[in-house]
Regions:
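Cell-envelope/ECM-targeting effectors and their regulatory/trafficking segments
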Residues: 1-3, 11, 32-34, 45-47, ...
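Short, surface-exposed beta-strand/strand-loop-strand elements in extracellular ectodomains
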Residues: 7-16
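Intrinsically disordered, low-complexity Pro/Gly/Ser/Thr-rich segments with frequent PxxP/GP/PP motifs
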Residues: 17-43
Length: 181
């Protein structure tokens, strides 16, 4: 689950017995969750690498970790992820320990130092993209106020979008497309 103010792409690494595999990219919007593994989890270790979308510039997400595993630029599944081949790049992965939810699923959260809850992460993500698009929605703090609403309304009006699009599940895709055009 993403509790950051960035739209991220995540890659997972699975260590099982003597084999390590990686898979990515899973796009996760702020305040959203993605299923990245299904079925019984038998892995010895689960590892994670995350990157912010290119629209943010240099990735603001620290690239650190104790394991170096192979990734690719586009979507990938790499079976032997400790020896990179052509088109694959070594990247740092961090071991994660998901927690069990009430419904029995395992969940792990990506978070910033600001420790946003889901609602704050979503709003901070919108503020961040508004600032990149040239609207004054600063500070990026996940707090709703007249300045954020004014910037959001100006953005929607300039793109000919109705206010209800903000609640749609594809709103971050809509914003990123607008920022990149």
């Amino acid at each position: 689950c993403n509790r950051m103010s960035y739209v991220v792409e995540a890659a997972i690494g699975i260590d099982e017995k003597s084999a390590t595999a990686t898979r990515g990219w899973f796009r996760i919007d702020p305040a959203a969750c993605r299923v990245v593994l299904q079925g019984a989890l038998t892995a010895d270790r689960i590892l994670l690498n995350a990157r912010a979308l290119g629209v943010y510039g240099a990735s603001p997400i620290p690239q650190s970790g104790n394991d170096t595993l192979c990734i690719a630029q586009e979507n990938f599944v790499i079976a032997a992820a400790r020896q990179c081949r052509t088109g694959q790049t070594p990247a740092p992965f961090t071991q994660i320990t998901p927690t069990q939810t009430d419904d029995g699923n395992l969940v792990a959260y990506l978070a910033e130092d600001s420790e946003y809850d889901d609602e704050q992460a979503r709003l901070a993500g919108i503020q961040r993209l508004l600032v990149i698009a040239g609207y004054d929605a600063a500070p990026i703090d996940g707090v709703d106020g007249p300045k954020t609403q004014g910037a959001l309304n100006a953005f929607l009006k300039s793109r000919g979008l109705s206010a209800d699009v903000v609640q749609s599940p594809n709103f971050f895709t809509t914003m990123i497309d607008a920022v990149q055009s």
